[in-house]
Amino acid sequence: MSVIKMTDLDLAGKRVFIRADLNVPVKDGKVTSDARIIASLPTIKLCLEAGAKVMVTSHLGRPTEGEYAEEFSLQPVVNYLNDALDCEVKLAKDYLDGLELNAGELVVLENVRFNKGEKKNDEELSKKYAALCDVFVMDAFGTAHRAQASTHGVGMFAEVACAGPLLAAELEALGKAMSNPERPLVAIVGGSKVSTKLTVLESLSKIADQLVVGGGIANTFIAAEGHNVGKSLYEADLVETAQKLMKECAIPVATDVACAKAFDENAEAEIKHVSEVQDDDMIFDLGPDSTAALAEIIANAKTILWNGPVGVFEFKNFEAGTKGISEAIAQSPAFSVAGGGDTLAAIDKFGIKADVSYISTGGGAFLEFVEGKVLPAVEMLEARAK
């Protein structure tokens, strides 16, 4: 993957436009989870230390495009940056006709979705963004799968378009896990539905040595082996697809499961062999034998790709499977990459953040990369590097 890297450029005195992912949750005007801002800070600091004139922007939430709405303003992010950095950070609301900046100064450009044409990758808007800068830095992996004016169009017209450190690290880690993995490669795919992860499963079945399935997805595979799944979430119309995937790749299917009669966090977990599941049972997690078997597979892996929990880990009585998988990944010396919103929540809950080699910041972008799709922002950066 050949792209220009920001770290290879001399940014002194240059106008630098960073497209970051600062789409953070905000409550009562305060940032409630700062993970994405923290991930972007090194890029911002590098530019400031290099003596660049720095502009950083992002989307936040889903405002009506082209209309200002205070609840979607980046002002809370500006307030956070003012506390986190040694310089004064201002918010620019009207910036499309140009800005005056000094070297070492940082300005946050208001939510890009307040600009009409942002989502449609409007050429005129893209050119206005490009006119603001000498160097465009794409550093938002989380939106790299969307061709929008601030993630794609601007890069087509900017004098120089490059990958920021966060994006470059993300591409490198995912490339290491997928393009040239040390084997065995074990892929873990959880989540509620096969249909939403079907392309991921198909893509990974071709490259993984073992494909571990969990959550509602696993129920469809249990049904594909001819077992009753009771009232569990599963997709009857995809049983044949599951059977086909099992012929193409080693997919260890659960032998025991944790069930209950109702979807309730206080419901008692009943451990059953898969052949004993009743018509009124609902499967919410892997059983201890299945968890132990998967932990052993993970222990022998050299590369691990993890997307999605393997049970309803939000409920104390049904967290054991995801906890067991998490701990096995944490203890494994393998190169591990994890991504997807629920996966990150599980990593936080079980405290294994420091033990995962790389945690992806992208939800949809992570999945599309794993599906083998070309990400528009990356395609643009490759084209501009030629």
Curated annotation (Swiss-Prot):
Q: Which Pfam families match?
A: PGK
| Biological process terms in GO annotation | gluconeogenesis; glycolytic process
Q: Which residues bind substrate?
A: D21, L22, N23, R36, H59, L60, G61, R62, R113, R146
Q: Which InterPro entries match?
A: Phosphoglycerate_kinase, Phosphoglycerate_kinase_CS, Phosphoglycerate_kinase_N, Phosphoglycerate_kinase_sf
Respond yes or no to whether keyword Kinase is given for this record: yes
User: What is this enzyme's EC?
Assistant: 2.7.2.3
Q: How does it assemble?
A: Monomer.
The annotated pathway is:
Carbohydrate degradation; glycolysis; pyruvate from D-glyceraldehyde 3-phosphate: step 2/5
Which keywords describe this protein according to UniProt?
Answer: ATP-binding, Cytoplasm, Glycolysis, Kinase, Nucleotide-binding, Transferase
Q: Which GO terms describe its cellular component?
A: cytosol
GO molecular function per UniProt: ADP binding; ATP binding; phosphoglycerate kinase activity
Protein's UniProt name: Phosphoglycerate kinase
Q: Which reaction does it catalyse?
A: (2R)-3-phosphoglycerate + ATP = (2R)-3-phospho-glyceroyl phosphate + ADP
Q: What is stated as this protein's family in its record? A: Belongs to the phosphoglycerate kinase family.
Write out the residues that bind ATP. Answer: K197, E314, G340, G341, D342, T343
Top EC class, one word: transferase
Intracellular or extracellular location(s): Cytoplasm
